[in-house]
Amino acid sequence: MKELFKIFVEGDADKRFISQLLEFLFKTSIDQGNIIKTSGWNCLVSPKTEEVYVNQMNRTSADGGVNLVIFDADADFEDRKKKLILWKERCHVDFELFLFPNNKDTGELEDLLEKIINPENQPVMDCWTSYEEALKQVVLPWREDTPLTLPAKKKI
């Protein structure tokens, strides 16, 4: 059976969010093989790994399906969009593009989640923010003035 879509995301949190969102919206389980974790936008466009993604996209397109790339805009929405469109043209692949948090601003999935959180859960977010701020204050001699951060939250 031919797949109708493939969604390319950066990481585990993105995959989990997209999967749960689609299941909620369409009231059906989503084949996890249709959501592909690339381990970051650099891996998608890297000459060492891009062939895997190009082949997957071309196969989906040949089967009449749609490819969707959903990545973080990070620190520069326009730059990230431009680089991904240039890669798309260079590799002759077809995909739709959406950049978190809202397809127009800089940011990432976590920024979107912070905006849509249920107000009842805001104390959890406040606690988490305090924890992140406390990590920045920790000084470790071998870190050479590099603050501690959480792996899932990139510094923008």
Regions found by a protein language model. Name each.
Residues 2, 19-37, 51-156:
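C-terminal accessory helical subdomains adjacent to catalytic cores in phosphodiester-
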Residues 4-10:
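Short hydrophobic beta-strand that contains or immediately precedes a catalytic carboxylate
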Residues 12-13, 104:
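Short beta->alpha linker loops
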Residues 14-18:
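Short N-terminal binding/cap micro-motifs at the start of the first secondary-structure element
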Residues 41-49:
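Conserved helicase/translocase motor-coupling segment
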